[in-house]
Amino acid sequence: LAPHATLTYTGDDCRKVTMTGKIYFEVKHDEAHPFDIKGDMSHVRVLGTKFMVSEGCASSEVYVISGRVLFTAKTEADGVILTKEMRATLAKGAKKPQIAESGSVNQMAWATHKFHFDNTPVNEVLNTLSCYYGTHLSANNTGKRLSGDFDANDLDDILSIIEETLNIKISQK
């Protein structure tokens, strides 16, 4: 669970939960007992997978790491089936989720506390780190690219490594 997220369930054998906020799930497939997630706007039926659900005040989002989920508006039957590395969003009041760009593996950094960059432009690296750490980062040379894996322990350590590796200067505001 991300900070301020909630998850409620009845405690019986029923695999139905209600949630708010952002939550990462790993769910084992059980055809006889499907796993259902209800949010304020959305309904997600799990078909065995690892995925994230983010239920905000203006939209809901589902990002699938592996497996499959069915993502629908709470009051509608028609939805979209998402598979590995697919993402969809449901705007408040919409009848059906829209498939969106898959996003980045770093979309799950809040849960994994790890970053992965593969020939990623520096400005994209800095945007990812800025969002995660709640700061603004900029560099004197954004034409370079970075490949590497980082634990999300200390931003200053990550920035030092990037600066030394790419011979750039990063400023933080």
PLM region spans:
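A residue-level detector for the "anchor" residue at the start of short, highly conserved motifs
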Residues: A2-K173
